[in-house]
Swiss-Prot record:
GO biological process, one term: cytoplasmic translational termination
Record's protein name: Ribosome-recycling factor
Location(s) in or outside the cell: Cytoplasm
Lineage summary: Bacteria, Pseudomonadati, Pseudomonadota, Gammaproteobacteria, Vibrionales
Primary localization class, coarse: cytoplasm
Entry's family note: Belongs to the RRF family.
NCBIfam families linked: frr
Purpose of the protein: Responsible for the release of ribosomes from messenger RNA at the termination of protein biosynthesis. May increase the efficiency of translation by recycling ribosomes from one round of translation to another.
Gene (UniProt): frr
GO CC annotations on file: cytosol
UniProt GO molecular function: ribosomal large subunit binding
Keyword set, alphabetical order: Cytoplasm, Protein biosynthesis
HAMAP family: RRF
Any Pfam family the entry gives: RRF
Matches recorded under InterPro entries: Ribosome_recyc_fac (IPR002661), Ribosome_recyc_fac_dom (IPR023584), RRF_sf (IPR036191)
Amino acid sequence: MINEIQNDAQERMGKSVDALKNQLVKIRTGRAHPSLLDTIYVEYYGANTPLKQLANVVAEDSRTLAITVFDRELTPKIEKAIMMSDLGLNPMSAGTVIRVPLPPLTEERRRDLVKIVRKEAEQGRVAIRNIRRDANADLKALLKDKEISEDDDRRAQDEIQKLTDVAVKNIEAVLEVKEKELMEV
């Protein structure tokens, strides 16, 4: 019973940290990274298809992404999808290869992005604390129904607090790496 609650809390906390990582990948740093275009979908035979299924995206250098399109007819559609995205990118095509130069980030924009990243991290911390609260509520319910002793309840709450501390440390580490990445010129 207690182990199930702890395992569930640990799994949910891990998912929260992973969700934060996925959220932060979408925030553009000064460096070219293929995952930057993961959120772009292209109209293909009447369905919105992820760009990575229609083309190969690689970082040509630190400031340029190269997109090799599998079907030449899709090149203009892919260019349009990139321009319509809110990433502020301006693709240039050369046959089946589309080059996407990344403009350098201004100091002000970097600071804005750091604020956004910190806000995302805080939302991650709140999610972790909510998971802890839910797990503790489940333990209290077991205690109230006399399914576990007060000692077991206390030990389990301590264990859940340790899981919470580890998850929050993971979030802090992810935040620190992303902030450093953003402020690097």
